[in-house]
Amino acid sequence: MGSTTDKIKGNANEAIGKAKQGIGEATGSDRLKGEGVVQEVKGKGQQAMGDAKDAAKEAIDRAAAAARRAAE
């Protein structure tokens, strides 16, 4: 999965999780609130994975550019 996909899915899961928590709070459903917390945390993890992939790609690109400059 690409970093953009991770971030999009993460944002969606985080938003859905927050909505579930709100609905669970409004209806008194501890189960729904709990599901919402889990889904929100999952979303934050997916976003972090996307950020990590971006950082790794940037580091690889910088290293490759430095290697090309050194070879000149």
Swiss-Prot record:
**What is the phylogenetic placement of the source species in the record?**
Bacteria, Pseudomonadati, Pseudomonadota, Alphaproteobacteria, Hyphomicrobiales
**Family per similarity comment:** Belongs to the UPF0337 (CsbD) family.
Q: Where is the composition biased (Low complexity)?
A: 35-47
Read off the Gene3D superfamilies from this record.
YjbJ
Identification of the protein by name: UPF0337 protein bsl2407
Which InterPro entries does the UniProt entry name for this protein?
CsbD, YjbJ_sf
Highest taxon above the source species: Bacteria
The segments labelled Disordered in the record are: 1-55
